[in-house]
Amino acid sequence: MSKRFALLWCSEEERFDYREEMVNAFKTENSDWEVISAFTDLNKIIDNYDGFVISGSEYSVNADKEKFSGLFEFIRAVHKKEKPIVGICFGCQSLAVALGGEVGLNPSREFRFGTDELTFQNGLNKHVGTSEERVRLIESHGECVIRRPLGSTLLARSDSTAVEIFAVGPYAVGIQGHPEISKKTLEQDFLRVHLEDGNLQEDEVRRFHAELSGYQPPQAIRQLVKATLHKQINFQNLVGDV
């Protein structure tokens, strides 16, 4: 039986759109997807879907918290019902804040744009079908989770971000990086917008391209999203760093 999932789109950016790419990254043969604006009344849809993915955003969970108060309430309601929910980048931070964690500026106080090497924690690699303990993942953020929700489990970290992936409860996962984005989208769209917005300077572009050399979206992280949505992993069964 096919399952229904919703991508909660948290962006109002008009210079590019990667909704279709994001859905395709996480879609399986037995799933149907719809894209829903995170700025609508989300409480009306909570029982219409089997799980949810929260997208990235140009907004801040701290500076724009009033704008997303409805999203935070929705996250708590979904979590209480133990429905699967995955947050990507801004979505990861929203998940953390809504469930009692804290988000702050990157430790470096600089915008992080490039790829980082993530190290899996608490045996996550075994649950996503890989023997590799490290993967490269695209990062594009000025803020990050600095305190996980109480009772959560750390699933991955990197040198730049202590909390790259975490889980709380049985089926809620936050991923700070962007497993959905292709190298092409990053180079053609994200790079252009970050240069226009001043998040990246021209003299940093060479470093960015060097980091991106040979990059492929990590299938292990995409599999983590799919397994979470389809309840193939119960994170409460993981024993580790809480």
Curated annotation (Swiss-Prot):
Q: Which organism is it from?
A: Acinetobacter sp
Keyword vocabulary terms for this entry: Glutamine amidotransferase, Hydrolase, Plasmid
- Per the UniProt entry, the signal peptide is none
Instruction: List the PANTHER family.
Output: GLUTAMINE AMIDOTRANSFERASE YLR126C-RELATED
| Phenotype upon gene inactivation | Deletion of atdA2 from atdA1 to atdA5 causes the accumulation of a considerable amount of gamma-GA from aniline in recombinant Pseudomonas cells and inhibits the growth of a recombinant Acinetobacter strain on aniline.
According to its UniProt record, which reaction does this protein catalyse?
Answer: N(5)-phenyl-L-glutamine + H2O = aniline + L-glutamate + H(+)
Tell whether Hydrolase is among the UniProt keywords: yes
Physiological role = Hydrolase that catalyzes the hydrolysis of gamma-glutamylanilide (gamma-GA) into aniline. May prevent the accumulation of gamma-GA, which is harmful to cells, during oxidation of aniline to catechol.
Kind of enzyme, top EC level?
hydrolase
Q: Which residue ranges run through the membrane?
A: none
One GO MF term on file is:
hydrolase activity
Glutamine amidotransferase type-1 domain ranges (all copies) = 4-200
Q: Which GO terms describe its cellular component?
A: cytosol
The record places the active site at C89, H178, E180
Gene encoding the protein: atdA2
The keyword Hydrolase is assigned to this record: yes
**EC number(s)?**
3.5.1.123
Q: What is the protein name stated in its UniProt record? A: Gamma-glutamylanilide hydrolase
